[in-house]
Amino acid sequence: MAKQTNYAQPWSQFYGPNLGYVIEMYEQYLDDPNSIDPELKQLFEQWGAPVLEEPVSPADDETAKTHQTFRLPETPTIFSKLVAAVKLADSIRHYGHLVADTNPLVKKEKKLRRLELDEYDLTEEDLKRIPVAFLCPHAPAHVKNGWDAILHLRKIYTDKIAFEFSQVHNLEERNWLIQQIESGAYYPSLANKERVALLRRLTEVEGFEKFIHRTYVGQKRFSIEGLDSMVPLLDELVRQAIEHEIDAVNIGMAHRGRLNVLAHVLGKPYEMIFAEFQHAESKNFIPSEGSVAITYGWTGDVKYHLGAARRLRNQSAHTMRITLANNPSHLEVVNPVVLGYTRAAQEDRTKPGVPVQNTDASFAILIHGDAAFPGQGIVAETLNLSQLRGYTTGGTIHIIANNMIGFTTESYDSRSTTYASDMAKGFEVPIVHVNADDPEACLAAACLAFAYRQRFKKDFVIDLIGYRRFGHNEMDEPMATNPTMYAIINQHPTVRKLYAQKLMEKGIITEREVDEMEQEVAERLKIAYERVPKNEDELDFIMDPPKPVVDRLPEVKTSVAKDVLHRVNEELLQFPDGFNVFNKLERILKRRSGVFAQNGKVDWAHAEILAFATILQDGVPIRLTGQDSQRGTFAQRHLVLHDVKTGEEYVPLHHISGAKASFVVYNSPLTEAAVLGYEYGYNVYAPETLVLWEAQFGDFANMAQVMFDQFISSGRAKWGQKSGLVMLLPHGYEGQGPEHSSGRVERFLQLAAENNWTVANLSTAAQYFHILRRQAALLTREEVRPLIIMTPKSLLRHPLAASDAEVFVDGAFSPVLEQPGLGADAGKVERIVFGTGKLMIDLAEQIGKMESLDWLHIVRIEELYPFPEEAVKDIIARYPNVKELVWVQEEPKNMGAWLYMEPRLRALAPEGVDVSYIGRRRRASPAEGDPVVHRKEQERIIRCALTKHE
């Protein structure tokens, strides 16, 4: 075949590492044409040696470029040099970070065998004969030949900023990164006035820390010193965001440097921070311009946990909100919470169907610790959310605040990887390592990260490598445990001093101007300090919850008109023409038809979908997530139907007439902590939305215990942070063993105080319907609180747990239910049995098989917390001859609700009336592993509860 000539195609599409591959294949082709891929062989036969167009600048104009065409030589010796040069260039790209100058304390050894010329049998003269474009097609104009290209690549990849992107598999992304990095397009060209402004910012950062260090001796502040450049880095990300008219930036970070970020990025007034150090009243200070939502709960939190929000406006009057999330000391657990904020800020929930997401509306910045990033499992859980349809936020910018130590633990004891950031490689996240002593390089890293996030909607990691000037906190003496590192740190100049020296050497600023800048900052801090009252001993802090929290929940209408329920019910059973529902499932669903016309029975899942449909008609958006939640763990829900022939999905709740808000249900990844934290964050940011998280079994909720403890139960008391999150925890003893029986209700009751949440264990479908509708009605009210429901498993289809249709039309949620048919003759009742949840249905089932039980009454406590004291008191008062109040439960005595209920029942028991317990004895494990043993225990408990003592 005759070779085509005079045209660079198809080779013009190859450059950089891709061109290197083509060159290597061509070398192999010259040795043995049959040793390569047939398609590539055909290209070489048709087009000959690869041809390349290299941009060439005329001698008199460095910016104007023409193109010169080169064809690969067919001489094996010259060709091998070209292949070697391409390999060298690729090695610099891939391994330059290993010798880069990113450690501010210790200079790395610059020599690495795989980056040296002799490793590839190359000389400077060899490289000078090679065109630039073979090695660095995006090089600036001053790079004239292959030798210049190698020097350029070494400078780019081994300086104060280093790059890792070989883990990025997407070719478009990798090529874009190469183009940005090697052309220098991402690196900002700062004017002198911008450099002076940067120095001023560093002076503010350092001055703030030094002032606190001198003024509040020995108080914890978790100084930013050594990572001062983090503040201008954040400034740059905020600047980029508002320039691109993003609506919201949400930040999550731990305690290190938090006060500085609050002051300088969030605009929290110095006076407020100083007042917190002095335990003085701080709420009277007017926030600085734009600073809003600095909130407190009634018990409060330490100053370096508090969040804040700020509004900024750009020149075109676009307003952007910056939020720093409230955070406990538990490292990294705020990460999914912030992503929940971000997703909520991105979605329009005002129309029926799936919420419309705009990832340009908001983005998240997560600031990690170098020990915590590889050490805390929730980091990996959160990274895994990044590309999932139910959780993606269009890319998070991660900043590792890397001070090369964790408390007293050196990096060699805290991770098994080269870098703190290495775990992110498993998620194909590009990584930049940057020396925190070079603030301009830090700005460049921010620019690259933001541009990548905006273009590809994916995560990006900035490994900001600095140090910690003092100990873990300001009372620690690090020389005792880390003497080598701190001997260097104690002699190391600050970032501000280094940058000031650099600007003075360039003639951009004078020493006098630097001194004046320091004095101005010090004076501002002094004035702020003097405004803070010093009368801390006279303060009378009130630590009582506000009245809406203390008060009982208001009465809200949860019943729905019969005609509305009938119409909604029938709409839920209509499918598009040609949509093929699985036959067995369709038969089950069709049984629901006509239930309101015939006053039939409604089971649990049916009640749930009716509640959801009517809530949507009330204009309340709904978001439900959990493992297998679309179908339901127990195949009960089926909110998403699948065409058995095409796999197409159909969601009946998207097609309800009169719906005014969005509905979505997502199957979550096999993760509890990150997903629950995400849903909590979503609900906090979008309080008008009914957000539900469902555990696959309640037993697995303790994988997210930190979220219950640090956020959901206590967030309002600590931070004033309201939530109406609903948690569905399948619970009940059915012989499935110790890991599929108990949602550990005792833990939620132990945490219950100050009306911080509602804990319910329901026994009927109508109760579930009404409590969901009540929660939806309270979402935007001050009385809102999280709702924990111990949901059933065996009751999902149990006829005694199903409810008459009329209860949905005329009923309401009742915290207490009484067993029908018992207690009619008040004078004969001697025992009142109290219990909750699924066991109440077991008792009801057994009662149906028994003779007269006029000596017995049974009361179901449907809402355990807040305890329905008045309702229980009224029931007890109806029975003048009662001798015994009994609490019955399936759980062991040291678990379940007994320890919570015992003192309450004793307080309500009339004089001379015993309070006793029936249930499993104290156990280390929640349940038996053998179903036969389980059945015998259940039978014993039921028998004891229903047997009269003679």
From Swiss-Prot:
Keywords: Glycolysis, Oxidoreductase, Thiamine pyrophosphate. GO terms for cellular component: cytosol; oxoglutarate dehydrogenase complex. InterPro entries: 2-oxogl_dehyd_N, 2oxoglutarate_DH_E1, 2oxoglutarate_DH_E1_bac, DH_E1, KGD_C_sf, ODO-1/KGD_C, THDP-binding, Transketolase-like_Pyr-bd. GO terms for molecular function: oxoglutarate dehydrogenase (succinyl-transferring) activity; thiamine pyrophosphate binding. Its EC number is 1.2.4.2. It catalyses: N(6)-[(R)-lipoyl]-L-lysyl-[protein] + 2-oxoglutarate + H(+) = N(6)-[(R)-S(8)-succinyldihydrolipoyl]-L-lysyl-[protein] + CO2. GO terms for biological process: glycolytic process; tricarboxylic acid cycle. Its cofactor is thiamine diphosphate. HAMAP family: SucA_OdhA. Homodimer. Part of the 2-oxoglutarate dehydrogenase (OGDH) complex composed of E1 (2-oxoglutarate dehydrogenase), E2 (dihydrolipoamide succinyltransferase) and E3 (dihydrolipoamide dehydrogenase); the complex contains multiple copies of the three enzymatic components (E1, E2 and E3). Belongs to the alpha-ketoglutarate dehydrogenase family. E1 component of the 2-oxoglutarate dehydrogenase (OGDH) complex which catalyzes the decarboxylation of 2-oxoglutarate, the first step in the conversion of 2-oxoglutarate to succinyl-CoA and CO(2). PANTHER family: 2-OXOADIPATE DEHYDROGENASE COMPLEX COMPONENT E1, 2-OXOGLUTARATE DEHYDROGENASE. This is 2-oxoglutarate dehydrogenase E1 component.
